[in-house]
Amino acid sequence: MTTIQAHIFKSLFSLLLIFGLTVVASAQPNVAKGMEQTISLKVSGVCGECKHRIESTAMDVKGVKKAEWDIKTDMLVCVGSAKMDKQKIADALAKAGHKSELAAADPKGYANLPACCQYDSGADKH
């Protein structure tokens, strides 16, 4: 092999190596995104104030990146990392006074809810 051929070979090898590393590096964010999960949980509430409390309480749980509660269906949808845990979300909501399909509301938490948010008192959704 001549020195010119060796130089061309080294240059091509270097370019392929750089290209390969670039492809691998750009794929990493997609791998991390794939590790996100979505959790749905039925949570009782009746109003906009409940919505704010439910969503902010869920957001305080480790791993939750987004929380959206639908007043019509009582469904809370959380998006977050693989570390997000459905039971931990339900437990945090129970402590805040909201029952869910996984946990009963803490009596103290429920008693501390504003009167308009006490969903078991027969309050209509508003």
Predicted segments with their positions:
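N-terminal secretory signal peptides that target proteins for export/translocation
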Residues: 1-7
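Helix N-cap motif at beta-to-alpha junctions
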Residues: 81-86
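Conserved short beta-strand edge segments in small beta-sheet-based binding/regulatory domains
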Residues: 97-109
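Bacterial N-terminal signal peptides
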Residues: 10-24
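Short, surface-exposed ligand-recognition loops at beta-strand->loop->(often short) alpha-helix junctions
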Residues: 40-50
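Boundary of Sec targeting at the N-terminus
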Residues: 27-28
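Short acidic amphipathic segments
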Residues: 58-70
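Short, low-order "capping/linker" segments at domain edges
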Residues: 111-126
